[in-house]
Amino acid sequence: MKKIILIIFSLYTITASGQQFFQTTPASQKWVDKSFKKLTRKQKIAQLMVVRLSDRRGKDVVFLEPEVTRYIKKYDIGSVCLFQGSSILQAGVLNRIQAIAKTPLMVCVDGETGVGMRFADVVPLPDQLTIGAISDADLAYRIGKAIGLQCKRVGIQVNYAPVVDINNNPNNPVINYRSLGEDKYKVSLFGSNIIKGMQDEGVMACAKHFPGHGDVSVDSHLDLPIITKSMQALDSLELYPFKQMIKAGVGSMMIAHLYIPAIDTIKNQATSLSRKNVTGLLKETLGFKGLTFTDALEMKGVTKFYPAGQASVQSLIAGNDMLCLPGDLKGSIKKTRKAIRKHQLTWNDIDEKVHKVLLAKYNLGLDTLKPILIPSLSEDLNKDVNKLKKEVYENAITLLRQDNPSILPLSASKKVAYVGIGIAGPNHFARLLQENYKADCFYFDNTTDSIQARKIISDLQKYDAVIVGIHQYKKFPANNFGIAKAAVNFADKIEKMDNSISFVFGNPYAIKNFSDARNLVACYEDDSLMHAVAVNLLKGTQQAKGRLPVTVDADFHYGSGILSKVLFPIVDPKTAGLDGTILNRIDSLANNWENSGTDHRGTDPKYELRYIFFSNRVCPDSENNIISQINVRSDI
């Protein structure tokens, strides 16, 4: 009986967790009804709009506070989305506009790598493709939790993350490294863990981009991508993670701008504007009950065919709840009212969506909104980010090939050269190699001519080991990630040397250019933390544990990765939780035994020296037990 009750309780908990943002109580119903009754018809429509709060104009970041303030006062808009700027500036703006809002604003952010993706003063967390290289799903949960804590601290209620598109097209110009990889099971597991981490902190996650943006070759910011797969193919791959996100209780989903004839044959109509996709497939067939956000309606994948507010109307007809960045707010409201008069929509449709949004606002804590505390804000947002980021890097770094067993770990006694490709001078990786190996450094960038390149190749012949670092290439695959053919040819000449090892710092898809390397490591990102992890791998104090989250070429498929050798570290006894005096006694006994000049080998147990290995979790009493197990002659 107890077991049955426990199972029922567990199922209830999972279901309740999935509906945490849409639970109705007498208190929530009272707040929703009160807020709803204050809204005019124009304001009801505006409650469904997400407005941009900042923009980049040239080199400058411009806060649109005056415009947004006008929208709040005139229309009582429902939501804003944060983009560029610093945390302190953003928080100041949010405090001011929340103070004048008649209905509290739902604050959103497009923060796939945390708020550091948008705030200049906050360190971003790892890219999702880097996370896809690790094996520990609990680490994905902790990343989600860290992002949730950041969002809460700076007054954000909804984060447009994670990306759960399966990136099965290496040339994808818009998703690519933003994905968790190409395996639907891993994408689903890690995506659901990130969601749970965020939502456990009371921040609504948003799985994107439904019904799957991973297999495109056109950027939807610039045009409308077309996917010609059958419904069966979509169901078996692209839709799989989204089904799992629904089971995991994700609070919202973002709808992609794609043209998929298998879902809707209306020519040039994006899936974000398709009733068959949003209402028919997502809500009715898959049973999703959370909020739906359109992808940004200012993107050309939509505006090319539905300009000047018409995209907003069609998004609502499709069944979306929230319209992200509609651009022409006044025109969107005007055309929505016109669509209602034409019976394309009803006020009941609008009212239902507004009630849903208000209920989410209540459950996100907007009924008791407090100002964001500015002091120590930046410090709080950065707290423990580098520690968590380093842990991800340590679990992600991937050894793909090791033809020369002596190159890894690399002895500090070797004569070492470092060749930085893509940089003109020393970076953190170069400085660490100089510090740890006294490495001589050479650099190859777009200013290096063929004569200089030949001289570098010639000079490298006198070294015991040559370390190659591939740096500062672009994250997206256009124009071969910005990697020049001359750089690829130069690297190839070095990589054919048995004593060379290549570290590729960035998008792993670029490894196709360096896959002939005799010794090869995928590093995923190009920052000082990853540089330090890579040097520790060279030294043997860090093990390569990662696996490729995507297929790179015929040599390196999804899941490729070799566990590297790791040297037993020398640590201070106190660090390992041990009593140094007892260890010194063991050393003394062992040295006396070894220096006695007597052969104690044999079967007599009183001359047996047992070498006992123990972890740093050994309890203090065990140390005395170790002493008691060492039997030596009393006269030694």
Each language-model region and where it sits:
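Bacterial Sec-dependent N-terminal signal peptides
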Residues: 1-21
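Preference for extracellular/luminal or secreted protein segments
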Residues: 19-70, 284, 306-570, 574-575, ...
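Second-shell residues forming the walls of enzyme active-site clefts
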Residues: 40, 80, 89-105, 115-117, ...
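Short acidic, glycine-rich surface-loop motifs adjacent to enzyme active sites
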Residues: 46, 68-87, 170, 246-269, ...
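Structural recognition of the beta-strand scaffold that forms the well-ordered cores
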Residues: 47-52, 78-83, 105-109, 115, ...
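Active-site mouth loops of central-metabolism enzymes
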Residues: 51-63, 128-141, 223-237, 300-306
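Active-site-adjacent structural elements in enzyme catalytic domains
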Residues: 87-104, 137-155, 350, 355, ...
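Catalytic loop of the DD-peptidase/beta-lactamase superfamily, centered on the K-T-G motif
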Residues: 567-636
